């Protein structure tokens, strides 16, 4: 893929938590977010999975030894970037379905 953003962010946990506990929070927070996909355990996001889409794939791993969480995300910066976000926001403002015009975007390059 000749485009895309793959991000890895690190955070220190204030207390020890399990993958399942944190996953419940992710699922609860993103359950109504049409374009956010929380991946299965041990599946890192890849830009090829979001190419040409408005989706953002996220996942995380916890290092219990250091009490750190590593959060990963992937998005197509040409669709989910400013243009796709503008269409998504316009849809919400105008009372249209959030995904209107964003499910079958053109693929170039």
Predicted regions and their residues:
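C-terminal substrate-binding/catalytic lobe of Rossmann-fold NAD(P)-dependent oxidoreductases
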Residues: 1-71
């Amino acid at each position: 893929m000749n485009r895309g953003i793959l991000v890895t962010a690190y955070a220190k946990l204030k207390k020890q938590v399990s993958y399942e506990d944190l996953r419940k929070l992710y699922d609860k927070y993103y359950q109504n977010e049409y374009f956010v996909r929380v991946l299965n355990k041990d599946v890192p996001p890849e830009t090829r999975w979001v190419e040409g889409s408005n989706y953002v794939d996220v996942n995380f791993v916890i290092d219990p030894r250091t009490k750190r969480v590593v959060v990963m995300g992937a998005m197509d910066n040409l669709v989910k970037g400013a243009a796709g976000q503008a269409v998504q926001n316009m849809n919400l403002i105008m009372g249209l379905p959030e995904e209107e015009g964003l499910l079958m975007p053109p693929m170039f390059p």
